[in-house]
Amino acid sequence: MNKRMNELVALLNRYATEYYTSDNPSVADSEYDRLYRELVELETAYPEQVLADSPTHRVGGKVLDGFEKYSHQYPLYSLQDAFSREELDAFDARVRKEVAHPTYICELKIDGLSISLTYEKGILVAGVTRGDGSIGENITENLKRVKDIPLTLPEELDITVRGECYMPRASFDQVNQVRQENGEPEFANPRNAAAGTLRQLDTAVVAKRNLATFLYQEASPSTRDSQEKGLKYLEQLGFVVNPKRILAENIDEIWNFIQEVGQERENLPYDIDGVVIKVNDLASQEELGFTVKAPKWAVAYKFPAEEKEAQLLSVDWTVGRTGVVTPTANLTPVQLAGTTVSRATLHNVDYIAEKDIRKDDTVIVYKAGDIIPAVLRVVESKRVSEEKLDIPTNCPSCNSDLLHFEDEVALRCINPRCPAQIMEGLIHFASRDAMNITGLGPSIVEKLFAANLVKDVADIYRLQEEDFLLLEGVKEKSAAKLYQAIQASKENSAEKLLFGLGIRHVGSKVSQLLLQYFHSIENLSQADSEEVASIESLGGVIAKSLQTYFATEGSEILLRELKETGVNLDYKGQTVVADAALSGLTVVLTGKLERLKRSEAKSKLESLGAKVTGSISKKTDLVVVGADAGSKLQKAQELGIQVRDEAWLESL
């Protein structure tokens, strides 16, 4: 039976590739169904012989307990946004300072969910969400139900690829029709539907909803020398790659492509929200490098957001954790990008003055970055009142005088004991990107603060189970879970704590970078500003902010109290040792290694202080080669770059 099962799996996978990837089926649906039923019957009779790449794995049937966290071997960076021709010109100017004659590749920006797929020996072993770029959720079983994702590759490769998982418009309409018939709330848009589907614990639901993918990048070090060649290679491996793309020599060509795509946008079978522009040559990408958050060699042009008119009803002023006082407009409800919007940010007092926003104005509201509702401008022809908005002079939380510094656009409360700032700081500390204390959300934090059970973040770790029972609506089971979540967070790697402290200019990426170098928050607190500023991608502003924070007596006391309660202050990830053998060197791995997996070689190089990249450039210091190194070895020799082999790496 094994031979026939092999034949059926090979045939059905080939037909599926023709249908989903090539859009060129060679057999009728009825023939595919007949062969599929035959395979199901054989697998039912001989379950021990079911093959790893059998298409029956896609049908569903598993109910998952939840999704485990998964650390990305290769981080997923965000992209810098551009909203105008002028911003694209500025991007081009920055690139040309480093690259004399760049060629760009323009690809559609799919409005879906970023995914990472990892294959070992050609078999899909992990499908993961983007998460925060460093840690995502393992949704492998759900992604196996997406019919155009290959379960196996034609080669026994170890490879990680990136792409977007989305819901086609036709599938979206079908899903919403079923939900309507079942009396369930409809999804607002295809992106929300795709996100909700991938979060399903029942894989059978995923299988029914006909999600699709476009792959756009090999995340693991590529043997191709350009993005365009990389896309063609992904196609050869059986992935679906969006065919709508161009190579461009200048911004005029890019802008023409953007205008063309904008006109076709509504007729596409899937949603897009822009065009991604990348430097095509991978060596040039390497020269340009990254900021802390984004590659310097790419930009995402975003199409203008949908706009609607609404009437301004009133303005709320709220205090954030840094003391900035933000105005929020209350509006007559409008439908915007698939959701009902009744509140929108007014940004700050300078924005209100610049836009001359007055009481009862009719305003244009849109979603900034397709996410945050914001007031864009006033419809002056519909103005009904000349009365200006009331700008507060005192903090709405603590009644302290508000300040408006010359170099800032916002009002600010500088009272360190302001209740709103303290509470927002506690909420931030417990949030997912910081200490990730499950269940300790804004509602519970507000109740703890109101009951005077917590005044600073160290107090969180002094709480006992019985303290939670004092809060309205909290039962014994919830109290136990909250206490357990707090105890578990003590073991977090220290970059989570550093971000949670809410130091100005120190975000999650910066926190990780700092701890990679200084290994612990205690070491960082003793570092001088010159040492911090010398770290690549950081600078004087961050260094000064850290120096100011750690110079205060309060920070010293807080860190001591956190340590006394058992909170970990050490970094648990891969550190960078300043005096390591390869510290500060840029290294390229190429060719087939015989004894080490590529991931093992990369980890070892990084542990020795090296930055491992995929392309050879003038910034490359060393190339480690295996068998069949090919053009990269030749290029290294031409550039006079030092070359070492696998045995040398093992000896370190």
Curated annotation (Swiss-Prot):
Cellular component, GO, one term: cytosol
The protein's required cofactor(s) are namely: Mg(2+); Mn(2+)
Keywords assigned by UniProt, alphabetized: DNA damage, DNA repair, DNA replication, Ligase, Magnesium, Manganese, Metal-binding, NAD, Zinc
Fetch the Pfam families from UniProt.
BRCT, DNA_ligase_aden, DNA_ligase_OB, DNA_ligase_ZBD, HHH_2, HHH_5
| Active site positions, chain numbering | 109
Domain BRCT as annotated: residue spans = 577-652
Question: Which chemical reaction does it catalyze?
Answer: NAD(+) + (deoxyribonucleotide)n-3'-hydroxyl + 5'-phospho-(deoxyribonucleotide)m = (deoxyribonucleotide)n+m + AMP + beta-nicotinamide D-nucleotide
- Which GO biological process categories is it annotated with? DNA repair; DNA replication
> A Gene Ontology MF term for this entry?
DNA ligase (NAD+) activity
E.C. numbers? 6.5.1.2
Q: Which InterPro entries match?
A: BRCT_dom (IPR001357), BRCT_dom_sf (IPR036420), DisA/LigA_HHH (IPR041663), DNA_ligase (IPR001679), DNA_ligase_AS (IPR018239), DNA_ligase_CS (IPR033136), DNAligase_adenylation (IPR013839), DNAligase_N (IPR013840)
| Annotated NAD(+) binding sites | 29-33, 78-79, 107, 130, 164, 278, 302
- Report residues binding Zn(2+): 395, 398, 413, 418
Summarize the protein's role: DNA ligase that catalyzes the formation of phosphodiester linkages between 5'-phosphoryl and 3'-hydroxyl groups in double-stranded DNA using NAD as a coenzyme and as the energy source for the reaction. It is essential for DNA replication and repair of damaged DNA.
> What does the similarity note say?
Belongs to the NAD-dependent DNA ligase family. LigA subfamily.
Q: What is this protein called?
A: DNA ligase
